[in-house]
């Protein structure tokens, strides 16, 4: 994908807005066209206004703009978090099986999420911390810090400190 315009376009279409309707009192219809094609970038203020019009926080999508399907990845990530919070290991395992069939989760940094969540299930669901430590340490060694969310790194350290 690679730019926020694609996400704006998909949200606009999902809401049934024309470019003209989306742009009203924000910018020109042509400017929306250029944003959606990746030829222009919206300012932070414009992104806020577009978010309000679309009823979605577009800022949340920046971490997913390089995904083939940012909506699917964002949804799975939210579901992973809910399962971890609720210690729902069966649902988490099911989600991981589904995620392994999504192309984005086969490449970094998203593949780390699948690996980490599998370890999380072993550590907290099966009480197998000891045999999971080497794999957790390996993940930390492999992480490219500029591509992985700091919260992810904190989660790995939290499991290691259990």
PLM region spans:
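A short, Lys/Arg-rich alpha-helix, primarily the initiator
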Residues: 1-14
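Alpha-helical residues within helix-turn-helix
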Residues: 10, 20-21, 49
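Short alpha-helical DNA-recognition segment
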Residues: 15-34
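DNA major-groove recognition helix of helix-turn-helix/homeodomain DNA-binding modules
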Residues: 45-60
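Short, charged recognition helix plus adjacent turn
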Residues: 63-88
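Flexible helix-coil transition and linker loops at the boundaries of alpha-helical arrays
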Residues: 64-65, 100-111, 140-153
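"A position-specific structural signal for the A-helix of alpha-solenoid helical repeats
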Residues: 74, 78, 110-121, 152, ...
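Helix-turn-helix repeat elements of alpha-solenoid scaffolds
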Residues: 83-98, 124-141
């Amino acid at each position: 994908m690679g730019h926020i315009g694609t996400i704006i376009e998909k949200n606009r279409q999902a809401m049934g807005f024309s470019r003209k309707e989306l742009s009203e009192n924000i910018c020109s219809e042509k400017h929306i066209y250029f944003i959606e094609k990746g030829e222009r970038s919206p300012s932070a203020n414009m992104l806020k206004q577009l978010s309000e019009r679309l009823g979605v926080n577009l800022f949340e999508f920046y971490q997913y703009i390089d995904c083939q399907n940012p909506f699917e990845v964002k949804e799975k990530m939210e579901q992973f978090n809910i399962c971890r919070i609720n210690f729902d290991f069966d649902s988490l395992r099911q989600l991981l099986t589904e995620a392994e069939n999504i192309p984005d989760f086969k490449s970094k940094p998203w593949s780390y999420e699948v690996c980490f969540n599998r370890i999380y299930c072993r550590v907290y669901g099966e009480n197998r911390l000891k045999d999971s430590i080497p794999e957790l340490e390996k993940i930390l060694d492999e992480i490219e810090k500029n591509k992985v969310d700091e919260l992810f790194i904190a989660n790995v350290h939290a499991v290691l400190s259990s």
